[in-house]
Amino acid sequence: MRLRTGWAMGFVMLPVLAVGASAQISLSSAVDLALRNDPRVKMSEAAVQKAHAALSETRDVYVPNLTANGGYGQGFGVPTGLPTVFSLSSQSLVFNYSQRDNIRAAASGLAAANLALSEMREQVEEDVVVAYLNLDSDERCDATMTQEYSDATRLVAIVQDRLNAGQDTRMNLLRAQRTAKQIELDQLNLQDEIATLSDHLSRLMGLSADRLTAIENSIPELPSVHAAAENGSQSYSPGVRSAVASARSKQQLSFGLNRYRLRPQMSLGINYSRIDTGQNGYATYYPSFAGKSQNAVSVYLEMELPIYDRLHQHQADEAAAEASRAHFETEQQRNQFLDGRFKLKRSAAELDKRSDLAQIDQDIAQEQVKVVSAQLTAGNGSSGGEQMTPVDEQNAKLTESARTIDLLHAQFQLSQAKVNLLRQTGQLDDWLKAAMRISEGIPASNVSH
């Protein structure tokens, strides 16, 4: 039985089709699931909600509150206060020099949280893309190794036959057997890595630890190294800009604390109280109160002028030092980002050349297989030249497989560097949109098992 589950986020997502303990999934679907299920994104979203609530809190001090309280009991002796049955009171801030800075600080904090969320989303996207590309590369390497192992076992059989006919040596047989065993061991290690990558992707996407496989044609072509490094419009990553906004928030908070002393603060208050003297001797001690209204209403404007406050002064000094530290920390983070991007550009250019070199080596190995096969088909030509044997043909095929695996590894390393550059230059989202368009055009039959 085939189980189909589809996810959508404003568009039709390519479904994940599962059979037993394995499933194929497109790149765009993997990224979408990770963005909605990864705990790091959830934590960043919660931080944004907290920052939004903090901003609302700084503004709500101007909104009048409403409080009700009451109580009733028997009193004896001299009354110590008004016999209030219940009261309603409301109070709000009217003016405070520091509050404007507090609002600006909270707004900058919200901006920092949103940028941190963008940074975390990009990090999750990068993690998923790199893991997906690695999985796709390893799966192709596994297919190549399967053919390579078949060629190696064929070589062992040929050398064994030649040894039995007295045309080869036991040393060559042992070497052929060792080659086959080494390929078998390498393939087992590769399959372990594939299982690890599949489990890692499943965890990123919030799925069960099913065996995931990549869909090669769901991966759009990556741009050139030059385009990935130079075409972006983003000078700094969202993480760096988040640090800048956070430092600005701390600076505004420092301003607010420094504007506390010798500056007036005004608040508005309203109070209504219901008085009852029936259960105590209040009228006895204050006879003029008898027969008067038992309703009390007061409206007041309160002003406070802090003159001397060592606690707030030290808090202001602490905030100023923290703002200064955040500023220099931001400068350091900015420099580290620029240094890392410069090194990545140089590294990507080198990996590009290495990939070209691996492609040439693989082409040479392919041509060598053609030459040896042609000579064997033609009967080795003239008797004066070097005679080709089936052993030479199998060795040429093994060399071709090894060069193909080297090429796949070089191409993955280059692709990883390009993805890193796309993220740092702000182009990763555009590239993933291309992946989405590709996924929408893949027929369902292409993702079945």
Locate predicted features.
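Terminal intrinsically disordered/low-complexity segments used for targeting and assembly
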Residues: M1-L33, N69, Q191-G232, Y282, ...
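Periplasmic alpha-helical coiled-coil/stalk elements that build and connect Gram-negative outer-membrane
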Residues: M1-R2, I25, R121-P238, S347, ...
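A small-residue-enriched
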Residues: S29-F95, R203, L207, G232-H314, ...
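Amphipathic alpha-helical coiled-coil segments
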Residues: M43-T58, M120, V124-M145, R154, ...
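"Short basic amphipathic alpha-helical interaction patches in structured regions
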Residues: L82, D101-G109, E148
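A broadly used, surface-exposed interaction patch
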Residues: L88, Y97, A105, L110-A112
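Hydrophobic alpha-helical hairpins/lids featuring a short glycine-rich hinge
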Residues: A116-S118
